């Protein structure tokens, strides 16, 4: 005789990381505060966009594993027109974030870039920084 061996095999789906990233124009203008005669106060000055979604970055995870998405803003090295420019990111509830956990549910997750700085010394039209997005499993 021979020996009979019974084995158990598990077949698993391969892990698929598939992420779509879309973004608005990411064009910003610095707006000086203006006098509001109704409130007798100046409106807030700062960086604004033309359209509501211009500062947005949307990530959709169409894979089958959850991912972490890291957001980073780096000020352009040759930017001399603006002092102390900093970029940060907020989620859809305006909560600050550096990393967003995105489940594999094919639902879009929106993040927005917020800019803060001193008032620019003059008007200019050029790249003010770089956004880096890192996808991690």
Name each region found by the language model.
Residues 1-56, 62-65, 137:
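Long, low-complexity ectodomains and other extracytoplasmic segments of secretory-pathway proteins
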Residues 4, 8-11, 17-21, 71, ...:
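Generic preference for hydrophobic/aromatic residues in regular secondary structure cores
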Residues 18-20, 26-37, 66-68, 76-80, ...:
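An almost-null, non-specific background feature
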Residues 66-105:
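Surface-exposed binding patches on compact interaction domains or structured appendages
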């Amino acid at each position: 005789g021979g020996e009979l061996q019974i084995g158990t095999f598990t077949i698993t789906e391969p892990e698929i990381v598939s992420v779509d990233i879309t973004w608005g124009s990411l064009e910003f203008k610095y707006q000086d505060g203006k006098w509001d005669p109704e409130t007798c106060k100046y409106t807030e000055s700062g960086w604004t966009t033309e359209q509501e979604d211009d500062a947005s970055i949307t990530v959709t995870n169409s894979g089958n594993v959850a991912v972490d998405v890291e957001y980073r803003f780096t000020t352009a090295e040759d930017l001399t027109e603006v002092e102390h420019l900093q970029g940060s990111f907020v989620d859809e509830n305006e909560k600050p974030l550096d990393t967003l956990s995105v489940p594999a549910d094919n639902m879009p997750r929106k993040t927005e870039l917020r800019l803060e700085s001193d008032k620019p010394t003059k008007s200019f039209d050029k790249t003010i920084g770089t956004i880096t997005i890192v996808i991690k499993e």
